[in-house]
């Protein structure tokens, strides 16, 4: 779809008559005037009407609409459209992406997904296959307005070498367009042997993040201890899959948090999914949340994938949404984010690497609305902070002019339509928003 705006191909211009969510402005000390029409009881959207000056790829100035000296400078009327910073997608699985046509999940269950991916990876994940599918996902992300992506890479045995080599190639190829990070993905028992240390060395040499899946088992405590030992020894951050289940007895998140406290771990720790919190007693939830807060663990929720997989039983309507307790975690002071997770693979049959879809679907699934409040941070500034990325995910003077401009004039309009005509600005320049054609991958299917 064609962008609804045309930005002049010059280094200096104004975006006029835009609306920026208050929570996405970098300077929260300034008294920004809110649009009164959106401050009515029962319909509150904290939006600021602004003109934004772009110069040499950066935001040079922010002024209330109709003010400031704009003489002899090209100006683009945004027509009251929303202006966001670019998205930050901190949890993806690019190496699994887009295999659905050749390896569907027959019953849509979590176990069905595991088995389908196991078969596909052992038979098909050679270098060219992985490269092309990962690059396809990056093309989608970039066209939709994403600025940074973290991907988890299945890393058992030789697959780790293949996928991390591809990741390094793509990180170099996409430098200046997308900031890429990679976390390895194995079950935590993998770290108990010499192959686990070899993997940690591979991750460190790739400037990556140490990752894995925590499953409840009699050796879980020892496995987590080993992961922390390796992370400290190799100076690596952690990004772990925890409690991707609706079994109330799963408390791997708590194990991780308690280990972080014991180790006085100073690196970043993110835990993903944390679904079982949604079905546990208040007392169990309190114990885990207190430990997570004390440890400084951050949580990324994957609402679209969790809604798809969790509580799925043939012939039975699901009773649970499968999403973690985002409101309660945030209220307790835990930093939370949302992300896209899998895309067109056995773990999630749909998706398009679109940060806006992640936000709108998450708002519907997790009731992140009425009011929207600061939830837009969950797909912008919060994941940027959790990934250790500076000057990303907010709009402010001196920040990069990496923006998504929507025709929608309010959050209500934004979430009611798909916004396929959005305008993407990177380093001050409008980019081509054309999405890659699925036919590009036909010969791999």
Regions found by a protein language model. Give the residues of each.
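N-terminal metal-binding scaffold of metallo-dependent hydrolase/deaminase domains
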Residues: 1-70, 411
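C-terminal cap of metal-dependent C-N hydrolases
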Residues: 40, 397-445
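Alpha-helical scaffold segments that flank or form the walls of functional sites
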Residues: 53, 83, 100-152, 158-173, ...
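Di-metal (Zn2+ and/or Mg2+/Mn2+) metal-binding site signature of metallo-dependent hydrolases
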Residues: 81-103, 245-246
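Histidine/acidic residue-rich metal-binding segments in metalloenzymes
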Residues: 162-176, 190-298, 315-338
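His/Asp/Glu-enriched, well-ordered alpha-helical/loop segment
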Residues: 237, 258-269, 309, 320-406
